[in-house]
Amino acid sequence: MGREVTHVFAPDALKNRVVVVTGGGRGIGSGISRMVAAAGGDVVIIYPVDSEKVHADKVIAEIVAAGGKASAYLCDVGIQSECVRVIAEIVKDKGRVDALVNNAGICDFTAFDDITPAIWDRHIAVNLSGPFYLSQAVVKDMKPRKKGAIVNISTVSAYRGGNQQVHYISSKGGLSSLTTSMAHEIAETGIRVNAILCGGVATDINVKQRADNEKKTGKPWVDRPGVRQMGVPEDLGKAVVFLISDASEWVTGSLVAVDGGALIS
């Protein structure tokens, strides 16, 4: 799906670094996992439920076949105790966490009037609370080394709005604010925190959601004028590699738009 993207970083840019990628087995997360592995990172994929393990295993197989390192852990990031548990397990098994990529997220298209407390609470739990609790856990591990990187995957829609996405966009707007606030507070620890504002990416789930929404509303999806073709997961992966590598050692508290021009269109 989409165009082919070539890795542009040295194969040792992330050598021996343990990089946790939530939702790293599907969609955008799979592109992030592959790009991190291609740069030498030891990829740790977090998947939410047993039925998703097959997708994580597929990405792991691809990475290992290419000579990389990857493993997977089960965790529902929408549950605080699960976030604490999984980071503790990873640190026990790997010795440390060098970088965390809070990529896992959900987005169910629902009209504002139809958003129930359950829908609202689940989006906040997965898209905002999960990154908060995971970040708390990894920062405790990173502080003694005075080095580490956290990247949150947010969206350009947090600054533009969007139909039937009030719950999703609100949670991602909170994630952007979490990014800048964390970066400010823990700057002296040597841990950097940045976010990527993601544009439209051609993933299986995204394409299906657009098709379902068109069927539901009876209106075709219209991309914003001036926006380049939809991105591919590896576009986000390259940006992540930059933000967790030494190439960005002077970058923290930044909200980086990787969107093909959507934010300015």
Model-based region annotation:
Residues D57, D114, E188, G199-P225, ...:
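A glycine/serine/threonine-rich, flexible loop-to-helix segment
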Residues K140, H184-E188, E249:
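Alpha-helical segment proximal to the catalytic Tyr-Lys
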Residues V97, A111-F112, T116-I124, T217, ...:
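Substrate-binding pocket helix/loop in short-chain dehydrogenase/reductase
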Residues G25-G27:
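Conserved glycine-rich cofactor-binding loop
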Residues T155:
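Residue(s) in the substrate-gating loop at a strand-loop-helix junction
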Residues S135, S171:
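Active-site helix of classical SDR
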Residues G2-F9, R160, V241, T252-S265:
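Short C-terminal tail/terminal secondary-structure segment
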